[in-house]
């Protein structure tokens, strides 16, 4: 299905395994403008891509930062955006990173009944870890040979998710924490399929023309330039409180902890995709403009996918009409987004 979608776009060229190496920026009449990127496809092999509009979907905002955009990182102070759950002082704390994996029981292998991860005994032979076990039905649970089973794996802190050395250190800690679990699984006939990379919840957040805040989410705000609908609660993983946290409880530093706090739908404004400092550039994904608390909600895949679709439409419009992305009207973008199955009408019910 994915290949068919790509084949239907004659002007689309997909380059896998590529990484942005450098950004081309020209001096504009007001702001500097991104005019292309240098992409590395193998060690020592790179090429230049010229562009009328570039979209940074790196997750960490690498292209935007290299282009000179202002970025936020870590927790914002309460006074920065008037968020009730923010700490009094800003710091560099970010959410934990997580390494997930699948397991599958090989035919004929004996069920795991002892020595399970976390000491859990599962007579069905399916070894869940924590709250991971997700099965389509009770029947599927009785026949573990039928499919793959997702495990949350391990969540570990990372001092700086922007630093590859620190990220590698967290990667190693996570693997060490799961090593015993994997040994038990292998012993009892399970294959283990680790995700190729550890999951990073939070890195740079690029300051845009609008900064999404906790108050927007709690109050279910739909700005007039909404281009995507978000429906996920505030969900900050493992805040730096010494005592066990509870939903809505208070941390050691005075913050109001918001782990899994459900909220109503809210809107992602187009201005949050438009960097404040640079032209010729849009951002989408978890690096779009928002606070640390707000990002704990909009970082999930369905929301960033919607924002990414809006950014793609906006980039096409800007290139076609030779306009800066910031000069587009949100109504133009919404009109095109209404053609595919994009549920923007929820914002205006």
Which residues does each predicted region cover?
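Acidic-histidine catalytic/liganding microenvironments
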Residues: 9, 28-31
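Flavin (FAD/FMN)-binding glycine-rich loop and adjacent Rossmann-like elements that form
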Residues: 17, 21, 31-36, 40-53, ...
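Sequence context of c-type cytochrome heme-c attachment sites
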Residues: 2
């Amino acid at each position: 299905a994915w290949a068919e979608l790509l084949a239907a776009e004659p002007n689309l060229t997909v380059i896998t395994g590529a990484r942005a190496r450098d950004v081309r920026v020209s001096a504009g009449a007001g702001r500097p403008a991104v005019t292309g990127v240098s992409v590395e496809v193998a060690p020592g092999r790179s090429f230049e891509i010229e562009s009328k509009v570039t979209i940074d979907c790196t997750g960490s905002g690498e292209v935007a930062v290299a282009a000179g955009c202002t970025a936020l990182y870590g927790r914002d102070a309460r006074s920065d955006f008037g968020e009730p759950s923010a700490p009094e002082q800003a710091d560099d704390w970010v959410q934990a990173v997580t390494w997930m994996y699948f397991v599958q029981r090989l035919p004929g292998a004996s069920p795991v009944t002892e020595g399970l991860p976390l000491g859990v005994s599962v007579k069905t032979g399916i070894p869940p870890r924590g709250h991971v076990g997700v099965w389509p039905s009770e029947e599927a649970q009785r026949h573990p040979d039928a499919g793959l089973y997702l495990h949350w794996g391990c969540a570990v802190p990372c001092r700086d998710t922007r630093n590859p050395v620190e990220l590698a250190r967290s990667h190693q800690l996570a693997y060490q924490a799961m090593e015993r679990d994997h040994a038990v699984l292998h012993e009892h006939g399970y294959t283990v399929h680790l995700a190729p990379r550890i999951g990073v919840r939070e890195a740079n957040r690029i300051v845009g023309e609008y900064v999404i805040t906790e108050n927007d989410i709690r109050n279910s705000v739909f700005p007039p330039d909404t281009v995507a609908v978000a429906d996920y609660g505030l969900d900050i993983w493992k805040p730096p409180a010494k005592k066990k946290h509870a939903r809505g409880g208070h941390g050691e530093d005075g913050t109001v902890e918001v782990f899994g706090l459900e909220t109503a739908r809210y809107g992602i404004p187009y201005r949050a995709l438009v960097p404040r400092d640079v032209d010729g550039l849009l951002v989408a994904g978890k690096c779009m403009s928002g606070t640390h608390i707000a990002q704990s909600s909009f970082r999930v895949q369905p929301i960033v996918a919607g924002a990414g679709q809006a950014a793609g439409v906006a980039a096409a419009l800007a290139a076609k009409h030779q306009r800066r992305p910031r000069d587009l009207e949100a109504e133009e973008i919404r009109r095109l987004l209404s053609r595919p199955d994009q549920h923007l009408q929820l914002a205006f019910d």
